[in-house]
Amino acid sequence: MTRRFGLVLAGLLVSGCSAGVPGTATPAGTASVGALPGDVEALGELVLTDVPSGLPLVPDDELEPPAGPKTLDDVAGYSDDVEREEQVLTDYGYRWGWERFWRDDGGLTSVFVDQFESADGAESYAADLARNDTDLYGGNPDRSPDGLPDGCSTLAVDDPAEESGLTAPTVFAWCAHGPFAVAVAVVGDSSDTALAEVDQLVDEQLDRLPRG
């Protein structure tokens, strides 16, 4: 499986990124729950557009590869073994995904939402992301975190290794929600602060997604 966040993090560090766009509540950020998205653009309308910390949104095209809409081929391209990853994602029933990032000095937040043909595919993918990020960053994941629904797990990296690419305490969350897999990461001043924001972000993002 791909180590998706780590590769995009490397792109952020290389690009430096501009100051970004201040977060505001746009129609995408206040979308109501309805039918399952029928295409990637409809999925993008359900992804959060601002974050509780107020970090500015990073324009999609300032990242390499760009954030925003993702195809199966895009996500497979994060892997060292693209052909195998394409087969895994196909087996999971991957349809499309969306990435969004917010960044300022010392702070970074990411939200990935991926849609699958079935809840089983989303659950398998979320579990794979959790396992691979845990292997990469170390630590012991919490598979029944307080305050988050069933199907979610979290990982707190209090003192990241220099080679990890993380610059400060970081908290990850991975959730399966119907046919959706949601991955959230927050780099903050402390793991407690990051965890509080992760919990809020997960709740807000899941509230925007239908279960199908």
Enumerate the predicted regions with their spans.
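Bacterial N-terminal signal peptides that target proteins for export
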Residues: 1-7
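C-terminal motif of bacterial Sec signal peptides marking the signal peptidase cleavage site
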Residues: 13-16
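A short acidic-to-branched-hydrophobic micro-motif
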Residues: 95-127
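Short, well-ordered beta-strand elements
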Residues: 110-112, 179-188
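N-terminal "mature-domain start" segment
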Residues: 18-98, 202, 206
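Short, surface-exposed beta-strand/loop micro-motifs that present aromatic residues
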Residues: 97-102, 169-177
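Short Gly/Thr-rich strand-loop-strand
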Residues: 37-40, 78, 119-172
